[in-house]
């Protein structure tokens, strides 16, 4: 059986997303400052079954296994209680789908290797690193033709040739530090999505207490930190920590609602009466109030104890 490309990451032992990001960083550090960023339109929904089975037949001799895979691909989808036949695509979230994607896209990998290109692919996320914009445009043109051959469609809106520092890959982007050293950071889009998720988790609903909000929030942030620990921008993590705690303080103020309740709770937690009175006098301005002297009544230590550990630690 022909070996899978070394540039293929994801759903393979010892080839995680972090490994793919590190390899991409190395290519940019070597001077390949432009990237051909390919986005395949609804990839898992558009995989051609006959095309995929033809590739599998070259690797698998057992016809019984091939028949099972064909049945897996053609299994109907339950939509509003009705089974819809599937004529293309692989089951979303299915355990075999990522592996089948790697097999289908291996042809793309081999062609890029044959041409000597520096590239990284993680499932259907493909980045090719080149030295000039013109080289990137040529690669983009050839890849469009290759994907048409595989009956796949390039998303022209999202695919582009751009500077590597202006692109993102698997949630990370790159920046140039002193000495022209390439560093990793969390892509702005990933930070935006994270903040949207934090807002969802900290919405006041069903009368949840601050402690009840913090439990799922802490789990989410722990997972987020575990993935993005590869970033080389500790200041960004510190800023996010401050924003999260600002958000939690605002949520708690909103929970107290009325000025009298707010004043009583703040004083009970150690805030000087004059400061508590100023906050309570503007009881409807939760976000602004939560940036004041509230760190006395609701210190960072409280959120640590509630399970919202800091990203910057």
Briefly describe each language-model feature range.
Residues 247, 256-313:
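Extended C-terminal regions of large enzymes
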Residues 74, 144-145, 149-216, 220-222:
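A conserved non-catalytic segment of reverse transcriptases
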Residues 85-88, 183, 199-213, 224-236, ...:
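Short, solvent-exposed helix-loop connector elements
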